[in-house]
């Protein structure tokens, strides 16, 4: 019973209500940034980093999706594709900034849809090789029912959806935190982690750059140093690192 109790506590600690957030546009730049939120989140959680890119003249657009309802492939087709087609087709470059499972969504999307004007991708805290927290929660049928099909897709099993995607064929960098506010999740994760994803499992072999910061999973995208580093990567293909 104790393990079920911990699972329920963990579920409520990460659940948030989704809400709509209309795309914001700034046409001073002819480059587009598409922001994709993570599991159990909404586009409002990326508002600060979106505003940061707006300040530098990028056209910024948000993808909102129902992570408790849709599988990752459905999210790509139903939610990401229309945002890209409607808002970014005539831009010189289309960049992506993602948080958490949003990184898995964009990996699938860019594996299926080849954009001739694709720029660079920044993944914030992506479970690129799965999450032990997803493994733990998916043991419980009630949690599976409440959280939907994406939960198992984010598992660390070699046969899981995320581990079937292969190595990305686009230019991307990963920013990962190594601080946690969630001791329960961090007990589940065997390595250094951000409270949701292990540092090791955020990495893939062909990353263009990697940056580790002392931030938590939930608030990583709100940190000034992360916003600055993300912009620098979009512009140069490298992260701006503190001395």
PLM regions: where:
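Proline/glycine-enriched tight loop/beta-turn segments at coil->beta junctions
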Residues: 25-32
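Sec-dependent N-terminal signal peptides
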Residues: 3-12
């Amino acid at each position: 019973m104790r393990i079920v109790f911990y699972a329920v506590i963990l579920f409520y600690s990460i659940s948030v209500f989704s809400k709509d957030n209309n795309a914001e546009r700034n046409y001073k730049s002819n480059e587009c940034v598409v922001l994709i939120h993570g599991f159990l989140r909404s586009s409002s959680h990326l508002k600060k980093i979106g505003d940061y890119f707006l300040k530098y003249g990028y056209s910024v657009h948000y993808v909102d999706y129902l992570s408790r309802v849709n599988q990752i492939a459905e999210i790509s087709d139903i939610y990401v594709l229309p945002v890209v087609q409607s808002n970014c087709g005539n831009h010189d470059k289309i960049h992506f900034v993602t948080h958490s499972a949003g990184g898995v969504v964009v990996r699938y999307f860019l594996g299926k849809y080849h954009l001739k004007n694709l720029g660079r991708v920044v993944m914030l805290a992506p479970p690129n090789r799965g999450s032990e927290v997803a493994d733990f929660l998916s043991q419980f049928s009630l949690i599976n029912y409440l959280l939907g099909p994406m939960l198992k897709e984010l598992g660390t099993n070699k046969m899981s959806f995320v581990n079937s995607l292969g190595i990305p064929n686009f230019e991307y960098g990963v920013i990962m935190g190594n601080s946690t506010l969630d001791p329960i999740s961090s007990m589940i994760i065997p390595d250094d982690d951000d409270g949701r994803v292990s540092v090791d499992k955020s990495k893939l072999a062909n990353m263009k750059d990697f940056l580790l910061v002392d931030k938590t999973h939930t608030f990583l995208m709100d940190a000034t140093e992360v916003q600055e580093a993300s912009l620098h990567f979009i512009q140069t293909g490298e992260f701006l690192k503190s001395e």
